[in-house]
């Protein structure tokens, strides 16, 4: 089996998560104007009016979520699997540690409200990408809150702190699920929600491009586990199509807890070499080779 630089795996994972969210264009300006125009007659209650408030009320009240993690990437000509952990502090940070041979921390990914940090501890390299200084992130208005919602299994609308029923159309899909849909100028989002638990079971983001190979991301949840009065997914599976080759990332979680005794910011060793975005993209292109 080929030995691939750990940063290549770390970078691939990081860019996957960014790609899964980059489709969410900010609606902050639009939301402001909508708020100013809400002096309208009350509308007839809809299925979304019933479902969305129950989902929001059921969101976890925990400030922290931590878990052990099994992390696998399949696609782009590679199959990779490592252990690790995930640590999250609400409204602040998401950290993922990738562990080789069950004992060595080989890579780390950190998402904050301001930047993405990816560290290759084996080769002593790192890349730090401030959202507002990377063109493709800034132009798509990537929002940390969207990424957090995906990991915490919560409903979201980009550019809003809390979504409302008015943001969605709702249609029953079978006897046990309802599909919530939201669309903006460039992208469409659907959330498959269980009527028995009011949890998100799948999020799909689709480009509105007429192209047959338009980008599409499916973010699926499974194996829900009771935790702190809430159900947290024991597995997240992400499928990305519309790339040169399909890509899948699977994360399986165990020992879900609310540990708060950890550093919420990763410190980069002064001896590590910082690499640039172009270097990262070159590594990703190599992953797609034969």
Regions found by a protein language model. Give the residues of each.
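N-terminal leader/targeting segments and the immediate start of mature chains
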Residues: 22-79, 279-290
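Beta-strand-dominated lipid-handling architectures at cellular/organellar boundaries
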Residues: 68, 79-87, 92, 199-201
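C-terminal motif of bacterial Sec signal peptides marking the signal peptidase cleavage site
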Residues: 17-20
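Gly/Pro-enriched, hydrophobic low-complexity segments
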Residues: 22-27, 163-273, 289
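An acidic-aromatic
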Residues: 93-149
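Bacterial N-terminal signal peptides that target proteins for export
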Residues: 1-10
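Solvent-exposed loop/turn segments connecting transmembrane beta-strands
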Residues: 75-79, 99-106, 186, 213, ...
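C-terminal low-complexity, charged extensions that often adopt amphipathic alpha-helices
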Residues: 137-171, 286-290
């Amino acid at each position: 089996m080929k030995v691939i630089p750990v940063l290549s795996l770390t970078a691939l994972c990081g860019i996957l998560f960014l790609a899964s969210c980059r489709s969410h264009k900010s609606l902050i300006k639009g939301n402001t104007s909508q708020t100013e125009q809400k002096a309208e007659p009350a509308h007839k209650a809809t299925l979304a009016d019933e479902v969305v408030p129950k989902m929001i009320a059921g969101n976890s009240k925990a400030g922290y979520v931590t878990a052990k993690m099994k992390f696998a990437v399949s696609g782009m000509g590679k199959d990779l699997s490592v252990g690790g952990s995930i640590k999250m502090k609400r409204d602040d940070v998401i950290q993922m540690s990738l562990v080789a041979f069950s004992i060595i921390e080989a890579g780390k990914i950190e998402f904050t409200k301001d930047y993405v940090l990816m560290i290759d501890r084996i080769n002593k390299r790192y890349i730090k990408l401030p959202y507002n200084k990377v063109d493709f992130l800034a132009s798509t208005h990537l929002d940390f809150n969207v990424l957090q919602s995906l990991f915490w299994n919560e409903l979201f609308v980009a550019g809003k702190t809390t979504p409302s029923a008015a943001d969605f159309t709702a249609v029953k899909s079978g006897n046990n699920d309802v599909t919530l849909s939201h669309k903006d100028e460039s992208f469409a989002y659907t959330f498959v929600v269980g009527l028995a638990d009011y949890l998100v079971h799948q999020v799909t983001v689709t480009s509105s491009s007429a192209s047959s190979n338009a980008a599409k991301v499916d973010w699926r949840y499974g194996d829900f586990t009771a935790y702190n009065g809430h159900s947290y997914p024991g597995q997240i599976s992400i499928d990305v199509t519309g790339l040169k080759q399909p890509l899948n990332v699977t994360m399986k979680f165990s020992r879900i807890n609310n540990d708060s005794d950890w550093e919420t910011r990763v410190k980069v060793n002064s001896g590590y070499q910082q690499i640039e975005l172009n270097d990262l993209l070159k590594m990703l292109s190599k992953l797609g080779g034969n």
